[in-house]
Amino acid sequence: MAAVTGWDRVEVKKRLSEEHWDPWMAWMNAYFPLSSSDRKDWDSKTWVRNLHELRLRDLLLFTLGDLRGKKVLDVGCGGGIYLGIVSKMGAAHIAGQDLSQKDIALARNRFQREGVPADIKLGNATELQFETESFDVVFSADFFEHVTLEQKRKIVSEVYRVLKPGGLFAIKTPNLSYLKFTTALRRVAAAAKLKSPLNIHVPHTRDNPDSEHCGLTTHAELEKLLFDRMFHDPEVIYPPLRWKGAAGFAARFLKGRKRFAEQIILTTRKPLFYGFYPGHD
């Protein structure tokens, strides 16, 4: 597609929000057609942050492996942006479940418009509306931070149920340990500038009426949930840190330590021997 020049920022945003089913799709379709000179006019921090998030999303999808011929479920699928990529990765069957009627409608309309068969269900993830042992791969991205610990237990049990023995389960969610660490650094920096550190807190956890991130978790808590449900020991993937300067130099030595991973990205598998045993539940 040729680069777009001489654009009006407000008009582009309005047009894209009307044409595209998901704000992230609108953002990507706004970014990539623009000329390099136009991109420079936009807030560089916003672009760096958003492109970094796309890299993290890629990293999760890379962990799913070869999806050709496989049945894949997205738990907490939202508008289906991940499933759209999964379908392009060759999955034989894609499915998703979410509690938001608006997001489910967006996903269904999108896949219908693109002619992609998709089994999209409306419902709570604590009760997945799919047959036992029906999926090769299940993943959940940017969802676990929105549910309580007790809900996570039920969701993990349901994922275990719908996965085939040996099936893969992948999770991506913000790392509470990292958020606490960086919040502490921001408070110290604020105090050094004679500003109140009390106004700085972990995002989406304070003064937020909908408690958007009520379920932020750590590697240890999440790994224990999986272990308690007899999943295999998780494989942890450490995403790259986007710090610059002295912090970026230090990040080279911090990579591989769970506390300093911005996101929790891990995979685990339903066991084979125990999974095939008829009395495992």
Which residues make up each language-model segment?
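Conserved N-terminal segment of class I S-adenosyl-L-methionine
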Residues: M1-E131, V137-A141, V156, P239-L241, ...
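Secondary-structure boundary/capping positions in well-ordered alpha/beta enzyme cores
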Residues: L67, H93, E114, E150, ...
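S-adenosyl-L-methionine-dependent methyltransferase catalytic module, highlighting the catalytic core
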Residues: G6-W7, R15-S35, T148-V162, L168-D281
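Short catalytic micro-motifs in class I SAM-dependent methyltransferases
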Residues: D142-H146
